[in-house]
Swiss-Prot record:
The lineage of its organism: Bacteria, Pseudomonadati, Pseudomonadota, Alphaproteobacteria, Hyphomicrobiales. The keyword ATP-binding does not apply. It comes from the Bacteria. Pfam families: 2OG-FeII_Oxy_3, PKHD_C. Fe cation binds at residues 98, 100, 161. This is PKHD-type hydroxylase RPB_2089. It is an enzyme of class 1 (oxidoreductase). Its cofactor is Fe(2+); L-ascorbate.
Length: 229
């Protein structure tokens, strides 16, 4: 399941992020890659243990956990501290085809998560750079993702994916992973679809409609059945 979520950050918030990020010191992005990924990764990152990355990351997590669409799609249990990268044309930056590590550990907090879902939050407008598409492969083919600044995409961490070479400008983004309460991707997808159907019925019939209440109960009972907390 691939889900795009608009307006996670406002234009003003994106401008605040970029103001401090553009003035920051960046390092080689291979420092956070696994052995195989490091062979095909060429980009820059904010130091992941730096106060700037941590502070901006906390703001992103706060925005996402208040976003109903994100919570519905992810059913998050643990969210890894967001990281930040930059792909610049001047550095011939790109990230070849790879799959994310199954488990991620944060050395500062000791947090370890199973990576069920990957998230990319775009912090550059599409017209600021050429190339730099996030290409995600699944059973239905390849999907090229290039979203407005402030929007994010949520996709299974099991997916092969890549970032195409940036040929003009710079692509700035945040990226991270999460562990869902619902391990099984098919179950999680059904929960997301069911929640969407319930919300549509609420709009038409109201929260007190008996059938809406019954479906809401089924939703919570399925969460109870599948959740690992």
């Amino acid at each position: 399941m691939l889900v795009c979520i608009p307006d996670v950050l406002s234009r003003h918030e994106v401008a605040e992020f970029r103001h401090v990020m553009d003035a920051a010191d960046w390092e080689d992005g291979r420092s956070t890659a696994g052995a195989q990924s490091a062979m095909v990764k060429r980009n820059e990152q904010l130091p992941p243990d730096g106060e700037l990355a941590r502070a901006l990351g906390r703001r992103i997590i706060q925005a996402l956990t208040a976003n109903p669409k994100f919570v519905s799609a992810a059913v998050p249990l643990q969210i890894f501290p967001p990281l930040f990268n930059r792909y610049a044309a001047a550095g011939n930056h790109h990230f070849g085809i790879h799959v994310d590590n199954a488990v991620r550990g944060d050395p500062l907090t000791g947090l370890r998560i199973r990576t069920d879902l990957s998230v990319t939050l775009f912090l550059s407008e599409p017209d600021e750079y050429d190339g730099g598409e996030l290409v995600i492969e699944d059973t239905y083919g390849s999907h090229e993702i290039k979203l407005p600044a402030g929007d994010c995409v949520l996709y299974p961490s099991t997916s092969l994916h890549m970032v195409t070479p940036v040929t003009r400008g710079a692509r700035v983004a945040s990226f991270f992973w999460l562990q869902s309460m619902i391990r099984d991707a098919h179950a999680r997808s059904m929960i997301y679809d069911l929640d969407g159907a319930i919300q549509a019925l609420v709009e038409r019939l109201g929260r007190d409609d008996p059938e809406t209440v019954k479906l809401t109960g089924i939703y919570h009972n399925l969460i109870r059945y599948w959740a690992e907390v």
